């Protein structure tokens, strides 16, 4: 049969804080995407416009005692995707998000526990995205994600994402 595609849902009536919603989402992610659990990803901030996820160095280390490039790529990709998932849950209900293009730049090695911050498009652009999803059922959204170390961007991601509403079951 077809592979199971997780549909992440949010109970909008729980009164949870945004950070608590992000943490609950990460628990779902750990269950449905084993790599996220292995990497020990954790939500540390979500304000409705930017999301920060962190990861410890130890399970993500390479042979040079720095963060493995694949782990860094995974973290920036998941952080951007999760930011759009959380935003769409809050504003649109159940949606799918898929990355359709990305560019990652590795500027400096990361030598300790690390975090990535995704910032959604500016309010006017993300509002236009919501309008398009409501009217056409889908839209594209671009965002930036960065991992900083020692006050400088060590890794950056620019990604295009498709966002579409989940058909009612």
Predicted regions and their residues:
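Polybasic, low-complexity association/targeting segments
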Residues: 8-28
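Short structured motifs
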Residues: 37-41, 100-105, 128-130
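Catalytic strand-loop segment that frames the active site of acyl-thioester-processing enzymes
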Residues: 38-67
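Active-site helix/loop of acyl-thioester processing domains in fatty-acid/polyketide metabolism
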Residues: 70-91
